Amino acid sequence: MSASSLLEQRPKGQGNKVQNGSVHQKDGLNDDDFEPYLSPQARPNNAYTAMSDSYLPSYYSPSIGFSYSLGEAAWSTGGDTAMPYLTSYGQLSNGEPHFLPDAMFGQPGALGSTPFLGQHGFNFFPSGIDFSAWGNNSSQGQSTQSSGYSSNYAYAPSSLGGAMIDGQSAFANETLNKAPGMNTIDQGMAALKLGSTEVASNVPKVVGSAVGSGSITSNIVASNSLPPATIAPPKPASWADIASKPAKQQPKLKTKNGIAGSSLPPPPIKHNMDIGTWDNKGPVAKAPSQALVQNIGQPTQGSPQPVGQQANNSPPVAQASVGQQTQPLPPPPPQPAQLSVQQQAAQPTRWVAPRNRGSGFGHNGVDGNGVGQSQAGSGSTPSEPHPVLEKLRSINNYNPKDFDWNLKHGRVFIIKSYSEDDIHRSIKYNIWCSTEHGNKRLDAAYRSMNGKGPVYLLFSVNGSGHFCGVAEMKSAVDYNTCAGVWSQDKWKGRFDVRWIFVKDVPNSQLRHIRLENNENKPVTNSRDTQEVPLEKAKQVLKIIASYKHTTSIFDDFSHYEKRQEEEESVKKERQGRGK
C-alpha cells in the first residue's frame, strides 16, 4: 500500500498528517517509510487523530487504544514540542480501576490507563532498553522493564484528572484484582479483632504506600494499649507468671498508670476503686460534720422516752425529766457568737418545738451547750421538777377535765407568737402583750364583754404546726406599761391572762374547721388576733380540751428558764457598758 493512496482515502476532516510530525510531498520520503505505521488494523479504527492534537476528541473518548506495542521502534516528535501521549480508556481488564488521568502535567503514571489485549498499562517513561535515551533507569523507583509494564499503574482519587497516586509494587501474595495495601488493611483488621499488638507488628510495611502500614500499626497499638499498658512494666514471660502474682496488684497498677502513665481515660476499675475508698479519700472536714450530726441526733432519740413517761407516769416527773433533756429553741441566746454559728448550722424548713422534733428536724443547738446539757440533765435530774414549775402547778389547775367549752357568751381570738420563749414567760408571769394593732383589738373585745363572758386566747407559735395552749384574758390592756421580760424589747403594753390549757395539739386536729370571716380558710391558717366565730370557737375548744396530748411546753420549762437567765445577764452587761 502506498502513502499517496492512503492519503487520498482519508476523510476531509482530517489533515495530511501522520503521527509524530507533518509529512508532505516535498519532503521526499519514500512510501516504505510509512509501512511500520500504516497497518491494515488502523482502517477499522479511523476515529482517532494525530497524537500531537491532545485536545481533539481522541483525548476524551477514543474507541480503543493503540494496536501495536511501543517496543517496536523509538519515537521522534519531529521537532515539535513534547506533549504527553494518551490513549483511550475503554473496557476494564484484570480488575484495574477506570479513570481519566491528567494529561497536561506529565505524570509518570501509565500512558494508557486501560491495557489492551491483556497487557498492563504502559508507562510513559519505562526503563526498558528501547527508551534508554528518554529517561533514567532509576527514575521513579522502576528497576526493570518488566516491573514497569507489570505493576506500574495509577490509582486516582477522582474520576477526572486530579493528583494521582503512584501505583505500588504488589506484594508477593497479592493478586492483581486488589488495590495496593489491601492485604495490609486486612491484616490490621484481624489484629484489631485479636486484640494483640503482636499481629500488628507482623504487618508488612510499604514505603510510600498510599495506605501506610505504619499508620495502621500505630493505630492498632494505640487501640490495644489500654489493657496491655498496665501489664507492660512487669512484662511476665508466661501466663503462669501472671497467675502466680497476687490478684489485687494489677488493679492498683492500672489505677496508677491510668492517671499518670498515659493520657487515655482510666479503666473502669478505677471508678470501682474510688467507690470503695470514698471514706478514706474524702475531705477531712466531713468527719467532724458527721460526728456533729450523730451527736445532735442523740438527744432527739432520748426525747421520746420522757414522752412515754408523761403519758403513763405522773406528769411532774416526766415534765421535769424532759425539760432537763431537750433544751434548744429558735430564739437567739444572749451570746451573739453562739447565736450566729448555731443559727447558720441548723435552720429547719419549718420550726418545731424541741420536744416534738423527732428525727425530721435538725434545730438542735440554738443554745451552744444544748446537746451536752440535755444529756447531763437526763442522767442527773430525771425526777426533779423545776421549782418554778412546781409553784405554778400548785397555783393553777392546768388542763382541767371539767372545762365548759359550750359558751353562750364570749369571744375567742387566735394569738400567734414569734417564739416559745414568750409563751414560757407568759405562763410564768401570767401576762401577755401583742402588737399595737392587736392590743387595740383585744382591749376593745374585753371591754365590750364587760364581764358577760370570757375572752379566750388560742396560742400558737409561728411555724410550730400545733397549738400550745389556751388562756383567758383577765384585764384590759395597759398601754403605759412595758413588761421588759419578752425576748424582744419592742413590745409595749401589757394585760393579765390566766392559762387554762398547756398542751400541744397538732394542726391536723383542727384543720377541718374553717372560718367564714377569714375567706373560709382553716383556723390553723390565721394571723395574730384573728377572731374565731363563737360556733367555730366551740368546736376548737372542745377538741383542745378533749385531746390527749403527749408533749407540752412544760417539757422544756427548765431549758427556757436557763435561757431567760442568760438573756437577763446579757442585758445587765449591756446596761453596764452604756453607763
Swiss-Prot record:
Compositional bias (Gly residues): 359-371
Presence of the UniProt keyword Hydrolase in the record: no
Record PTM: Ubiquitinated by the SCF(SKP2) complex, leading to its degradation.
Induction text: Following heat shock stress.
Region (Disordered), start-end ranges: 1-45, 247-387
Gene Ontology cellular component terms for the protein in this record: centriolar satellite; cytoplasm; cytoplasmic ribonucleoprotein granule; cytoplasmic stress granule; cytosol; nucleus; P-body
Region annotation Localization to mRNA processing bodies (P-bodies): where it falls in the sequence: 2-384
Subcellular location: Cytoplasm, Cytosol; Cytoplasm, P-body; Cytoplasm, Stress granule; Nucleus
Pfam family, one: YTH
Gene Ontology molecular functions: C5-methylcytidine-containing RNA reader activity; mRNA binding; N6-methyladenosine-containing RNA reader activity; RNA binding
Phosphoserine carried by residues: 2, 4-5, 22, 39, 196, 359, 394
Tissues and organs where the protein is expressed, per its UniProt entry: Highly expressed in induced pluripotent stem cells (iPSCs) and down-regulated during neural differentiation.
Residues that, per the record, bind RNA: 416-418, 422, 432-433, 462, 486, 491
Residues recorded as bearing N-acetylserine in the entry: 2
Membrane-spanning residues: none
Domain YTH: 410-544
Keywords from the UniProt entry: Acetylation, Cell cycle, Cell division, Cytoplasm, Differentiation, Host-virus interaction, Immunity, Innate immunity, Mitosis, Nucleus, Oogenesis, Phosphoprotein, RNA-binding, Spermatogenesis, Ubl conjugation
Predominant place of localization: cytoplasm
Effect of residue 441 to A: Slightly decreased binding to RNAs
Comp. bias regions, Polar residues: 291-316, 372-383
Protein family according to the UniProt entry: Belongs to the YTHDF family. YTHDF2 subfamily.
Protein's job: Specifically recognizes and binds N6-methyladenosine (m6A)-containing RNAs, and regulates their stability. M6A is a modification present at internal sites of mRNAs and some non-coding RNAs and plays a role in mRNA stability and processing. Acts as a regulator of mRNA stability by promoting degradation of m6A-containing mRNAs via interaction with the CCR4-NOT and ribonuclease P/MRP complexes, depending on the context. The YTHDF paralogs (YTHDF1, YTHDF2 and YTHDF3) share m6A-containing mRNAs targets and act redundantly to mediate mRNA degradation and cellular differentiation.
Name of the protein described by the UniProt record: YTH domain-containing family protein 2
